[in-house]
Each structure stands twice: as C-alpha cells, then as structure tokens.
C-alpha cells in the first residue's frame, strides 16, 4: 500500500483539514462515525482509499491524519463537532498557549514543548503503514503556528523520514487583505526554513479564492467555510488518484518528477475548474475543452499572479469524471496553438495528464454545483515569482525600520535569521528569473550553476 499521512498545523491547517476530510468521507461513503456500509472487506483491505484511511478490526475507518495547534479552541471544535468520532483522540494535539502570530514562538519557545508528542503520534501512524509514501502538510504562512511550528516539524520529519516526500498545501498571505501585521516576517522565515525540506508546495491565497467565490459562485461575503470547501475540492482532485482507481493514475512522487525541474523551484500554481453555482450549472454543459481553457484564465487561479507575464515550466492536468483521453488531447492541442501561453524553451512538451473516473463530489448544501467532470491544473510557472517579490517588498518596508522585530528576538531568535531568510528569498527570486531566460547561447556560463 502507498499510504499518505496528512498533517494539519495551526488554525488554517486544521480548518482546511476539516473541509478535506468532510469531502473525503462523502467521496468514499464513510459516515461521520467512521463506518463504511459499502466496504465489504472488513479489516485492512487493499482498497485504494486505504492510502488515506486505516481500518480497525471493528470496521471503523480512521483518517491517517494529525491535527496540531498550539492553542486549543480550533481543535476543540473538531473534538465536539460532527466528525468527533472519526478521529482518534490522540490524533488531535493541542497546546495551552498559542504562538501569537509569532514565528519564533511556534518554532522555538512554544513549539519545542509539543514537537516530541507530535512526532511520537506520527510514528504510531507511520507504523500502521505498510509502505508510507509521504506526508501532506497543511498550514498557513502568516500565522505563528502555521509558519513556525510547521518549519520545525518539516525539519524533524526530514530527520526521521529522510527519503519520504513532503508536500505542502500552504495559505499564502493575500496581497490586499491581511490577518496579521507580521505576516511578511512569518512567511519569509518559514519559506526559508522549509525550502530545503519540502518537495513541493501548492500555494493558495485567500484573496484569490474570495474573488472566485464572489465572481463564480455569487457569494457576496464568502466565509472561511466557503473558501475551505473550494480548497478541499482542489486537494481532493490532487489526491483523487491516490484514493481511487483510474485510467491514468498519479502518485505523490510522480507530481514532483513532473512539476519540479530544480529542487528549489517547487511552488506550483493550482487552478480548478469548473467553479460554478448550482443555478448556473443547471443551464450549461461544460465540455473538456471548456474546463481546460478555464484553467488558463488567471481569474481561476488560487494565487494572485499573472502567468501571461511568466513562462510555464511544467503543467499537470488532473481530470476527474466523464473524461476520455481523446478529448484531453484535442483540448491540449488547442491550448498549444495559443500564443498567450508560453513554455520555457527547454521544456517543449510540458503537459502531464491524469484521468480519474470518479466524478467530483460536492458537499450537500454547499455552494458548488454537482458536475460531470472537473479538472485541477497544477502548473509550475515563473510568474509565481511576482508573489514572492510582493512579499519581499512588504518584508523590506517593515524590516528597514526593524518594526516588531523585538517580539521575535525576545523569544530567542537572532536578528541574523531575518537577514539570512531575506537573502535566501532574494536568491529564490533570482532562481526564477534565471529559469525563465532562454537557454540558447548561455550554456557555457550556466554550467557550474546546478
């Protein structure tokens, strides 16, 4: 079996986790108490969904997941919520005091008190696996726990499970709206620390998802539940090939192989289509070509940046539902003829396709319409450098005045870590710039680079 363990860190990670597991349960017909009437093989059968759920002798299905937060309120909602029987109490780990939006608290002072418990529980989950494939880590960049504790966890997971892949789903600070003043500090510190430990990081930003909810679903004031359910659909699409049998299945390492050309350039953009409300879907039939084209619209992206200014290095199209390879091929051929979509010259083909026959499931009473087919596109484009540049600029404005730095130093960090992290980010921006430049005629100087 190729099991995957999900780690949900901090408020954002936990709330994304709630949305994801709610959706997984619906997709597999697992009830909130973990029973699965449709499952005939009692005890650990070799069904595809066992990558995400372990089975007890009593026929209960338990998510292979760990929820961690340094303060209890958010996880307490899971403990008392509708899915409280789904999780083993040991999978829900909370501290007493929160990280207070401070990376240093999450990574050093408060985080180190809880990290050993988390790793111990992770070890228990890993021991139940026959062939652990890797970890999915859900967190935000802006919060103290999401940034600080995640980076500590990633470092420790690298030590304990060296070769296992680690994929992140990270909430990137939105360009305009912000939940914390110190988001740029936390984001840059966490990106720097986890850069060498993460194999692939899918970023979503709240503002981009707000806009999608407003524009496509006509929700005037989207709540976090609306946002998380949309993120849940994306995560579900990415993991569908691990949980169902399909025509072209994609496993965790395959994503990395196809999306990550250089170890540091591992931040693909996610785009999902169709995002459409039930009223509209009733009146239109969306073909494979329609949803494929929608993926190349910047408006449907989960991070605010414009791929038309950048170049694509790799692109992964994950279809689910009523899709046949012939339709996909013609849709891709049509895309390739468009001038607005540019690939780097050293990656001529650039499309990887996955097809899964399980149609997308929607949460009853949710905002998304039930559709016959959907696609999630993961593209590694140089345009994401815009997002880093934006963040670096905000960091610079604050750091020039050393604003708020004393909170970090007071928790045992050194000021040198800030400048080190910022230099690493500058290098990352430069890496993206170099990857985007055409390779012809520059081979001689580039030789010693990689």
Curated annotation (Swiss-Prot):
The record marks 450 as: Involved in polymerization. Coiled coil: none annotated. Residues 431-450 are annotated as: Disordered. The active site is at 254. InterPro entries: Alpha_tubulin, Tub_FtsZ_C, Tubulin, Tubulin/FtsZ-like_C, Tubulin/FtsZ_2-layer-sand-dom, Tubulin/FtsZ_GTPase_sf, Tubulin_C, Tubulin_CS. Its main location: cytoplasm. One of its GO terms (molecular function) is hydrolase activity. It catalyses: GTP + H2O = GDP + phosphate + H(+). GO terms for biological process: microtubule-based process. The modification N6-acetyllysine is found at residue 40. GTP binds at residues 11, 71, 140, 144-145, 179, 206, 228. SMART domains: Tubulin, Tubulin_C. It holds the Pfam family Tubulin_C. Some glutamate residues at the C-terminus are polyglycylated, resulting in polyglycine chains on the gamma-carboxyl group. Glycylation is mainly limited to tubulin incorporated into axonemes (cilia and flagella) whereas glutamylation is prevalent in neuronal cells, centrioles, axonemes, and the mitotic spindle. Both modifications can coexist on the same protein on adjacent residues, and lowering polyglycylation levels increases polyglutamylation, and reciprocally. The precise function of polyglycylation is still unclear. Signal peptide: none annotated. One of its GO terms (cellular component) is cytoplasm. Its EC number is 3.6.5.-. Tubulin is the major constituent of microtubules, a cylinder consisting of laterally associated linear protofilaments composed of alpha- and beta-tubulin heterodimers. Microtubules grow by the addition of GTP-tubulin dimers to the microtubule end, where a stabilizing cap forms. Below the cap, tubulin dimers are in GDP-bound state, owing to GTPase activity of alpha-tubulin. Dimer of alpha and beta chains. A typical microtubule is a hollow water-filled tube with an outer diameter of 25 nm and an inner diameter of 15 nM. Alpha-beta heterodimers associate head-to-tail to form protofilaments running lengthwise along the microtubule wall with the beta-tubulin subunit facing the microtubule plus end conferring a structural polarity. Microtubules usually have 13 protofilaments but different protofilament numbers can be found in some organisms and specialized cells. Belongs to the tubulin family. This is Tubulin alpha chain.
